[in-house]
């Protein structure tokens, strides 16, 4: 499954999640069989070219998320996690909060 995370850079180890309007890059995480398969970085979400993305993980619950839900994505929010590795570990153990209407 594919997961978007708005981040402050394009380094898989050092990039940190940021509010979507502060994102310098968008990390696209390919998560399958309980682990991260790959992480690719894009300048904008549109650069992916319309491929289906299952989840988006946002920095806080006050961000605009309705457009993502309209696109069919599940929207999750981090609690304390900042790095991609920590976020994906929390995702794996269902420790992220879900946003819903």
PLM features: what roles do these ranges have?
Residues 1-52, 79, 83-101:
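Non-catalytic interface/targeting segments
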Residues 51-81:
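Mid-chain, well-packed structural core segment of small domains
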